[in-house]
Amino acid sequence: MWVALILSFAMQGLHGADPAARTIAQDDMSAIDEPRQVVARTRTDWESLWRAHGSNQPAPKVDFSTESVVAIFLGSRPTPGYSAHFLRAGLKDKVLTLEWAERRPEADSIRAQVMTSPALFAVIPKFDGEIKFQKVSP
């Protein structure tokens, strides 16, 4: 299965329209306000992560027999307009590396002065090996 995963990532990237990495939730106000990247491979881990995130919505459904959840928490930001997105993935020495970037608001844009804690949740095809997150410049 991981060969198909890597080929899919390499050919299409990890954008929201890519079926290999499906965004299941995105939020500007996570209760997790420290930068963190997380993999949830079980329903128990996912429910615990979702509770820590602090959403008042039910956790999105995930089929853990075929999928894993990957999440990025940016930590506290001074204004709205920040978000994370996946760029691509690569497999080397049995380690799956997920490259991601942070989007920032335009420097000259007018924004509310309110603290945010952006979070991104996506599902990827199940991968039992080590998963690393690598932040890159867009």
Predicted regions and their residues:
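Sec-dependent signal peptide recognition
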Residues: 1-7
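Exposed, flexible binding/inhibitory loops of compact, secreted disulfide-stabilized domains
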Residues: 9-138
